[in-house]
Amino acid sequence: MNTILLQNLVNPNVNLQVVLPEMIVALTGIVVMLYDCFVPRQRKVTGAISLIGLAISAFFLLSTWNDPAYTAWNGMIAHDGLRLSFSLVFLFTSAVTILISTVWTDRENVPVGEYHAMLLFATFGSLFMASGNDLVIIFLGLETLSISTYVMAGLRRNDLRSNESAMKYFILGSFASAFLLYGMALVYGATATTNISEIALKVADPNFPALLLVGGSMMIVGFGFKVATVPFHVWTPDVYEGAPTPITAFMAVGSKSAAFASFLRVFVLGFPLIAGVQASEFLHESWITALSVMAILTMTVGNIAAILQDNVKRMLAYSSIAHAGYALVGFIGAGMARSDQERDSAIAAVAFYMLTYAVTNLGAFAIVTLIAQKNDRRTAFEDYNGIGFRSPVLAFTLSLFMLSLFGLPLTAGFMGKVLVFRPALNAGNTLLTIMVIAAVINSAISAYYYLRLIVVMFFRERTTDWLAPRIPTALAAALLITVIGVLYFGIFSDGVIESFSKSSAVNAIRAER
């Protein structure tokens, strides 16, 4: 018996090291839940435990940064550049969300232990969505993330808006998951496998079954919901507005990044060149056209709707839809890449874009959380009137985040957009060139609502009494980290994108470990 157990432990297909970051995050979540059972409502302790667990997970992830790419667990787990870069985004997002949440958990009557545990379990699911090289693993990771997020969205049990947000997210999220799962089932029926690497080989065959196209289309619907692309975006504004602000920040960044990681792995690596130009040029052009139109609509609808908003959270919700469209430009560029190196660079660009979006958006939501007060009472534009003179630190910091979201040069948002647009522009395709032009025009349109908030803060008089809130230490740390990130990634982005590209190229995957 001991010999069999030892053989399993040293079996290259059962590599515990490759899933160590995920295991650490899951175990930390369990520890937080157990601690909260015996010593409830210890916000600082459960928060500290969560941050330590995330830091240890990041340490083990970084220790494997220069390892060659490989798969493990019978090909179900992939260790490559896509996994590494996106996993760092998830861990960073969760850590900053915990720091932002301190001011919220202090003033709201929420079960803080459950909140930290759910956030860790959501991160655990996100990590598997990036590392999963099998449709089953990706779906399990997605559901772990989704269920945890449903719970967090409804943590304010006595708030009708929070309850409505959680219910809408649960119903529509379940509907999208059903589409995704049915699509995966059809792909399995067409290819007799759920392994993404094996699916890629099947797609390259010109005689692949038509059922594969139906399955792929249904999976696009499922991923489109999770990413919040048009026309699958309708849930986003109501859910983002009703959910507690720190949870909204996590959903806007963490959930979206995780969905993009899986989207890239399935449709760029599993369906090479987006359903395989080797199989059918007509089919290839059809996929490109459909996704390009989706990207243009997502950017345009998101920006136009954001202009019409009078609530900052709803404005940021529609802004996140537009940013999903920008990231989709890089996704399509990766699918159109003419070589493995170009494809890896495009994937790294999308990961970098999600990192810059995370840094900027989390910083903005940190200030919104601080100003909103209990039950998010102050989230309208008029609540920001004149705060530039009463709290210049908050106003100037929020202005920096708005300018980065717009894409002002020397900010992280600018470099993120430049790098994510480049692969599509280099593809030499007329439709993709039009898509990039549309993205640039939409970026210019977005200046209206981002600058509107800045104008409100500095050029509108306040008609009500307002005292500048005290900035807690943890939230000050979150703001400092995000401000440094916005400036650093805007000026010194070359090193980061090069590291993402070289971490371990996805095309280098060869053998099991």
Identify the role of each PLM range.
Residues M1-R513:
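Alpha-helical transmembrane segments of multi-pass membrane proteins predominantly involved
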